[in-house]
Amino acid sequence: GDVLVTPLQVARFMAAIGNGGTLYRPQLIEKIVGPDGSVSATFAPEVVGALPIQPDRLKALQDAMVNVIKNQRGTAFFRIGEMPIPAAGKTGTAESSIPGSPHAWFAGYTFNSFNGKPDIAVAVIVENEGEGSDFAAPIFRRVLEAYYFGSPQVLYWFESGFGITRTPTPFGGIPTKTPKP
């Protein structure tokens, strides 16, 4: 039968895998800061459950998800394997109601607090587009680059079709011209 899950539910599940099994209530606001810089309210994370998994199996799952990105045989290696951000994830390709046009999924999380920022979990779905490794995984990488570096670091092959003609400036460098497809 059909599996009905939202990207938020998948991201929450990824966060729990990454943090050792704790499920938190999703929240959008950490604190409220006034114009003078004073904090008028803070919102602590709320634990609402735990994943029903043994620690050794959770560790095996985490290791497998790192290999999806870092192992040359991993499904996301060729799209995001050289990314410097420590991350783990899973590609997915889901059937759609349009024959030959599956939904592309990628979900994952970061670890080791890269660049001094807190870890995050992200779920990406690109409907009716293709394989998760081809379309959703590069978007996952883009989200991480925007979060940790403030801008994307590479231009993907499919972006030239959107009218993007220059590679984003990596770490303050000079952008380069993108070849025509």
Identify what each model region corresponds to.
Residues 109, 160-161:
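Short, isolated positions within intrinsically disordered regulatory regions of eukaryotic proteins
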Residues 1-49, 65-152:
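Active-site beta-strand/loop architecture of penicillin-binding DD-peptidases
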Residues 161-181:
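Ser/Thr-rich, Proline-interspersed low-complexity disordered segments
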Residues 154-159:
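Short alpha-helical interdomain "coupling" segment at the junction between an upstream regulatory sensor module
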